Amino acid sequence: DMYSDNLGLCDN
């Protein structure tokens, strides 16, 4: 799933 990490980037 895609989510916003602490840096505001998208992780798959």
Swiss-Prot record:
Tissue-wise expression: Nacreous layer of shell.
| Descriptive protein name | Uncharacterized protein SMPP4
Q: Which organism is it from?
A: Nautilus macromphalus (Bellybutton nautilus)
